[in-house]
């Protein structure tokens, strides 16, 4: 009889331990699933943002290409003017703007 009681107590402790482990695992699973949902939503939002940025880059590239073609046409139509150097004061004025990309001018330019 005492062995039976000890065996029942041991089985009860093992069952409680297993139940506790199951509850903890189930709780961790719920937390992980919530994190997966959050990360999936974040990834989808980033994909939308990336697609929007790609579209804007293509639009800017198209506008840049159009403007480049217009400048090239204007220069071709005004070859005598286009073949002369741009005056230093004009270069300085154009390059002294935010976002302007100009080569460094030496004093002899």
Swiss-Prot record:
Protein topology in the membrane? Single-pass type II membrane protein
Q: Keywords for this entry?
A: Coiled coil, Cytolysis, Host cell inner membrane, Host cell lysis by virus, Host cell membrane, Host membrane, Membrane, Signal-anchor, Transmembrane, Transmembrane helix, Viral release from host cell
GO BP annotations of the record are: killing of cells of another organism
Q: Look up the coiled coil feature and give its residue ranges.
A: 27-63
Instruction: Specify the superkingdom.
Output: Viruses
Please give the GO cellular component terms listed in this UniProt entry.
host cell plasma membrane; membrane
Q: Where, by residue number, does the polypeptide cross the bilayer?
A: 1-17
State where the protein is found.
Host cell inner membrane
* Subunit composition and interactions: Interacts (via C-terminus) with the spanin outer lipoprotein subunit (via C-terminus). Part of the spanin complex which spans the entire periplasmic space. The spanin complex is composed of spanin inner membrane subunit and spanin outer membrane subunit.
Q: What does this protein do?
A: Component of the spanin complex that disrupts the host outer membrane and participates in cell lysis during virus exit. The spanin complex conducts the final step in host lysis by disrupting the outer membrane after holin and endolysin action have permeabilized the inner membrane and degraded the host peptidoglycans. Host outer membrane disruption is possibly due to local fusion between the inner and outer membrane performed by the spanin complex.
What is the name of this protein? Probable spanin, inner membrane subunit
Question: What species was this sequence derived from?
Answer: Pseudomonas phage phiKMV
């Amino acid at each position: 009889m005492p062995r039976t009681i000890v065996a029942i107590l041991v089985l009860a402790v093992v069952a409680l331990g297993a139940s506790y482990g199951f509850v903890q695992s189930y709780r961790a699973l719920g937390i992980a699933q919530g994190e997966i949902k959050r990360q999936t939503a974040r990834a989808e939002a980033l994909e939308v943002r990336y697609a929007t940025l790609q579209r804007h880059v293509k639009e800017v590239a198209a506008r840049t290409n159009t403007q480049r073609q217009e400048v090239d046409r204007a220069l071709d139509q005004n070859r005598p003017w286009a073949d002369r150097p741009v005056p230093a004061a004009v270069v300085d004025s154009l390059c002294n703007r935010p976002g302007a990309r100009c080569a460094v001018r030496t004093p002899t330019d």
